[in-house]
């Protein structure tokens, strides 16, 4: 067992449960599309974040150290994707029927986004550089951290989706839904600002 598994888990919980792009999109999707249609997003985050951790542990972190420009480019690509996503959320369909025909965020979009999500990339770099060392404990520690990331990711993203579904009960008319979508879009844009502070 990793000697610092408790602090690793606490860090993972704080990183996963606090507001950020993945959680805002889960909240929005749960609100607008329900639990079942948000499953691709849930699975994309649940598998994508641990896969990012694995890639970093296996050497991607060294590429970032030697070529920091690559990490900067990924941050800017992630920012552009979030702006696009905020636009999509803000101007989503005006009617309930159109919403039923729309597809929420797809699995592959969410999975790939984990490599562009500045909050997730930063959390992963901290986890890998602080708690995983090359040597005889590498496989054991990496496995434990990835399992923790899987559990924390699925729990947090599912909770945010259920919160979105719960808030749907208060949506009494289309105007409320439009304002909700504008608010989620604004929160997503606000989360971008925090990456540059």
Residue positions per predicted region:
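Membrane helix-loop-helix hairpins that form the core translocation module of multi-pass transporters
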Residues: 36-106, 163
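Hydrophobic alpha-helical transmembrane segments in multi-pass integral membrane proteins
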Residues: 53-57, 116-128, 186-197
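Juxtamembrane transmembrane-helix termini in multi-pass membrane transport proteins
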Residues: 2-69, 126-145
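Hydrophobic/aromatic residues within the transmembrane alpha-helices of Major Facilitator Superfamily
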Residues: 13, 17, 50-51, 87, ...
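Residues that mark transmembrane-helix kinks and helix-interface sites
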Residues: 21-24, 83, 122-125, 157-161
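Selective transmembrane alpha-helices of multi-pass membrane proteins
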Residues: 65-94, 150-156, 160-163, 168-197
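Residue-level signature of transmembrane alpha-helical cores of multipass secondary-active transporters
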Residues: 8-12, 45, 110-114, 149-153
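Select subsegments of transmembrane alpha-helices in polytopic membrane proteins
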Residues: 44-48, 111-122, 181-184
